[in-house]
């Protein structure tokens, strides 16, 4: 750390209670009051260095002059250093006191008009030559500039802006190593590698080497100015987002950051070490952080945005803040994880366990960015990313519905509205939505047959896997209409599969006749395997037909079949969720 030693005389100042006495052998003729401390000094050393004190005491007629300097920058501690400088007593100028000394010198008008190498010149030179060129010293100087009594004059003298500019320049430098004369403090977990330049050993650092320092030492107003300056220098938006994220995790307790002791209360959060954060302070900090985050898609992790959203609900942040977060999450919903999407319901009137309304708004924002025509156009150009994104979101929402479905207070309309936002054609399989529907029906046994049928409109029975079909065919909770549709489509699938195997076997027979004799054995083995597969499929089909016959024999089944099949002349097929009154025909299987 840089320092500047001034003066050569030994210590002559002594404190008695709240009074500073200067023991030089001469009777004091000046008393200066600074807050709760008084200084008994002499006119000549002070007036020869300070234009302000010269003007002040020249108007006084008393033998002993009295002055009050309660608003001097830095308070009694800084004025003591100024007084020692005037008497030529040894003092040390450091990055911690340089700013307050510079401001106090300006306040007291200690310019070159009142002696060579006066305090304004010396402190200004020290700041320019030693403090602003060093990262650590600039941080310390800026931290001291934020003191209430120092800040106004520090702003007027452009000390704050120069500190911020110096820090921003170093943060933006491509080569942020010790060549530029500033120590660095890497975030925890960051590794460094050793590199050599002309035989000189240095440490290569990552782009986030400055995150810890600015997050630890700068309050929010100064951090905002710093990050805006860095951003104006063209730094990548991803680095800006990473820095803001680091700052939030370190300074927003309810976000779940480094200070693990303590627990939130209605009034605020106490994290030990006499550190207390009111909900109002945290809410204000969170809202400012959301404004600082770059709006560019995917530069901020979806996980962090969801954590911010959850915290904003706990702190009852402004509606604008929550809407901004929901919109940004919606833009990159395909990057979200299910566990992060399970946001507890923080509303006073909330009955449900999770906030499904917020998730629905997030999904609405995502769907606004999804245009099927654009997807088709990009697919023709060989870009499958849009389709992959919405497929991932469909799987995510199916999983979310399965998690919230067991909540007895979740209304049917809410469940349907959320599930219906996903277009049917983007799901490669409907097993996920079927699982969610089954859980919901199980948790809500009071649903009527009609309501269950409406719920099943969310899935397409033709897109269920073999395992899901087997489960659905034996699921007594499903409406009978849906069970019949599942059986019908599975039977059609088996017939198609059998026909495909038979067609393949005929082709193999034709080909085997043209092959040489030594290949006939292999062809016969293939044919034997095909026949066994066909036999297995026929047995499976027969088993399903028997299950269907059992349903038909019941009274309810007869009434149901007479209702949905009617005349055999109607032969339209209806996937689950479409064509509710169209007839279904299940042809008989000949044994």
Curated annotation (Swiss-Prot):
Modified positions (Phosphotyrosine) in chain numbering: 434
Residue span(s) of domain BTB: 28-95
Keywords: Phosphoprotein, Ubl conjugation pathway
A GO BP annotation: protein ubiquitination
Gene3D superfamilies: Potassium Channel Kv1.1, Chain A
Protein family per UniProt: Belongs to the NPH3 family.
Record's function text: May act as a substrate-specific adapter of an E3 ubiquitin-protein ligase complex (CUL3-RBX1-BTB) which mediates the ubiquitination and subsequent proteasomal degradation of target proteins.
Protein name: Putative BTB/POZ domain-containing protein At5g13600
Organism (species): Arabidopsis thaliana (Mouse-ear cress)
């Amino acid at each position: 750390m840089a320092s500047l030693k001034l003066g050569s005389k030994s210590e002559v100042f002594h404190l008695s209670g709240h009074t500073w006495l200067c023991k030089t052998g001469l009777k004091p003729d000046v008393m200066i009051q600074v807050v709760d401390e008084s200084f008994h000094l002499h006119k000549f050393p002070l007036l020869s260095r300070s234009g302000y004190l010269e003007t002040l005491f020249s108007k006084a007629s008393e033998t002993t002059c009295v002055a009050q300097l309660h608003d001097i920058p830095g308070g009694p501690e800084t004025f003591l250093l100024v007084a020692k400088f005037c008497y030529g007593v040894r003092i040390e100028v450091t990055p911690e006191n340089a700013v307050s000394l510079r401001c106090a010198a300006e306040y007291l008008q200690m310019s070159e008009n009142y002696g060579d190498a006066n305090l304004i010149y010396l402190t200004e030179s020290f700041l320019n030559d030693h403090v602003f060129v060093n990262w650590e010293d600039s941080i310390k100087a800026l931290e001291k500039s934020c003191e209430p009594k120092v800040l106004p004059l520090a702003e007027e003298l452009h000390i704050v802006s120069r500190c911020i500019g110096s820090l921003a320049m170093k943060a933006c430098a491509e080569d942020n190593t010790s060549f530029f004369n500033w120590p660095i403090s890497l975030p925890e977990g960051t590794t460094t590698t050793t590199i050599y330049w002309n035989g000189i050993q240095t440490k290569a650092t990552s782009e986030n080497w400055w995150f810890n320092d600015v997050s630890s030492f700068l309050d929010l107003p100064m951090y905002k100015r710093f990050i805006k300056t860095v951003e104006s220098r063209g730094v990548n938006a991803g680095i800006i987002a990473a820095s803001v994220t680091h700052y939030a995790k370190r300074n927003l307790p309810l976000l779940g950051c480094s200070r693990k002791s303590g627990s939130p209360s209605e009034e605020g959060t106490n994290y030990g070490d006499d550190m207390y954060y009111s909900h109002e302070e945290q809410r204000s900090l969170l809202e400012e952080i959301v404004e600082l985050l770059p709006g560019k898609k995917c530069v901020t992790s979806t996980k962090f945005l969801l954590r911010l959203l959850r915290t904003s609900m706990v702190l009852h942040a402004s509606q604008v803040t929550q809407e901004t977060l929901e919109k940004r999450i919606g833009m990159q919903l395909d990057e979200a994880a299910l566990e992060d999407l399970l946001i507890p319901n923080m509303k006073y009137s909330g009955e449900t366990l999770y906030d499904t309304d917020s998730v629905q708004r997030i999904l609405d924002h995502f769907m606004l960015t999804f245009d099927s025509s654009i997807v088709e156009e990009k697919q023709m150009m060989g870009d499958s990313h849009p389709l992959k994104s919405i497929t991932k979101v469909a799987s995510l929402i199916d999983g979310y519905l399965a998690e919230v479905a067991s909540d007895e207070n979740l209304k049917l309309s809410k469940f349907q509205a959320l599930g219906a936002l996903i277009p049917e054609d983007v799901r490669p399989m409907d097993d996920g939505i079927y699982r969610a529907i089954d859980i919901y029906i199980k948790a809500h046994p009071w649903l009527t047959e009609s309501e269950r049928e409406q719920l099943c409109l969310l899935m397409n029975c033709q897109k269920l896997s073999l395992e899901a079909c087997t489960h659905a065919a034996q699921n007594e909770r499903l409406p009978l209409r849906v069970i019949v549709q599942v059986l019908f489509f599975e039977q059609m699938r088996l017939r198609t599969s059998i026909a495909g195997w038979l067609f393949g076997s005929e082709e193999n027979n034709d080909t085997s006749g043209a092959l040489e004799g030594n290949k006939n054995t292999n062809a016969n083995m293939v044919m034997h395997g095909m026949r066994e597969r066909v036999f297995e499929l026929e047995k499976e089909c027969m088993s399903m037909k028997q299950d269907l016959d059992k349903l038909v024999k019941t009274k309810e089944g007869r009434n149901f079949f007479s209702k949905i099949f009617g005349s055999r002349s109607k032969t339209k097929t209806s996937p689950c969720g479409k064509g509710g009154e169209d007839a279904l025909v299940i042809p008989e299987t000949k044994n």
